[in-house]
Amino acid sequence: MASKRLETLCKSLTREVGRISSQTGRDDYDARRKVADIARELINETTHPSDVAAQYTINMAEMACLRMFQKWKLLDKIPASGSISYEDLSASINADKNLIARMGQMLVATGKLRQTSPSHVAHTRLSTAFAHRSPPAVWFSMSFDETLVPWTQWPRYFAKYGPRQPSGQTAVPMTFAEGADGELTCYEVIARGGPERMADFADGMQGIPELMPAAGIYDFAWVGEAVAEGEVDSDMPLIVDVGGNLGQALLEIIAHTESSIPPDRCVLQDRADVIAAADALDNPVLKKVRKMPVDYHQGQPLKGALIYYVRRCLHGFTDEVSIKLLKHLTAALPADPRARVLICEQITTTPPDPYTTMMDICMMNVGSKERSEDDFTNLVTAAGMKVIKFHRGEGVATHVIECARA
């Protein structure tokens, strides 16, 4: 029986590999994911149960070494072509050469770096993704620091609080792991870590564009068309990005609509410190966007916008806090029947998707969760709105939930 299963998987793998070379863009990502999923099934079928624990330990050691190579910017110092010695790497940060060599050997052993001689290493196709603050690099470092550390404290956390879902803002695994249990919120813990930690968190929360696209799921083209036809008042804000960080999503949306949505009629809202950071960026499009520091938990000061856009915010909040935030947006909607609240989030499915389920376990550290379609429908209804449609991106678990006043 096992042999028959392996034969089937091998045939499927060969078929899907043949499709990769003919795909581009989003289709290429889907094809690669199918190949990886089948390969993972093959590994599961051929791995002896007694080998799993050892493999997990190898993975943990690899991640620890990779994080330190990132932290010390050693990956940035490895040339794009050619190699570098452990001696030169260690000298660049005044480190113990043997320490750097031992960590590097772990990355060589798992295929993340390539050994060109016993004392030299070079990049591989995969390691370059973790250098120079690329989106995957920032995502990994943020995930390691802000989620893996609390996960390691789960046994102690649940021993104290019992086998119940974490809730609230201060008595959660993340604050527990930081020694701030019952004293600080998660954001206060991150802020306490200083500007570098805050920047890593802000950048990391934007995620990896391939997995969490801001554009291409919901069609914003109608907004630009309405402007061109003079169908909206000239003083009406078009898109208000609530909790929009440094404007990454707005920039993606504007670019995707070929700039038919005027940037000066878009608004970026976030905490004052984040808005100050966005103001300092040298981006000609972002400079035209109106920036507004707000506490969106206390209310929505800008009324009457055509679209209020909330991306990757609600999954960090409890149902109670999310409903309160959405009620503020409901109250801000104009009478225009086209006015919308758009919620961009991952949505849980049955059977579970690995990526979304991972995000749900991450959110457990801060006392929140990822949600199903029914969960979002309940939130939206409680906030005085109705769901018009769930828009799903091809090959990703990210949705845009289109909402209007009930």
UniProtKB/Swiss-Prot annotation:
Null allele phenotype: Impairs methylation of the flavonoid skeleton at position C3-OH.
Pathway: Secondary metabolite biosynthesis; flavonoid biosynthesis
Binding-site residues for S-adenosyl-L-methionine, renumbered to this chain: 270, 312
Record keyword Nucleotide-binding present: no
PROSITE patterns xrefs: SAM_OMT_II
Classification via Pfam families: Methyltransf_2
Active-site annotation: 315 (proton acceptor)
Family: Belongs to the class I-like SAM-binding methyltransferase superfamily. Cation-independent O-methyltransferase family.
Function, as annotated: Methyltransferase; part of the gene cluster that mediates the biosynthesis of chlorflavonin, a fungal flavonoid with acetolactate synthase inhibitory activity. Within the pathway, cfoD is responsible for the methylation at position C3-OH of flavonoid. The pathway begins with the PKS-NRPS hybrid synthetase cfoA that uses benzoic acid or p-hydroxybenzoic acid as a starter unit with four rounds of chain elongation using malonyl-CoA to form the chalcone skeleton.
Name assigned to this protein: Methyltransferase cfoD
Organism placement in taxonomy: Eukaryota, Fungi, Dikarya, Ascomycota, Pezizomycotina
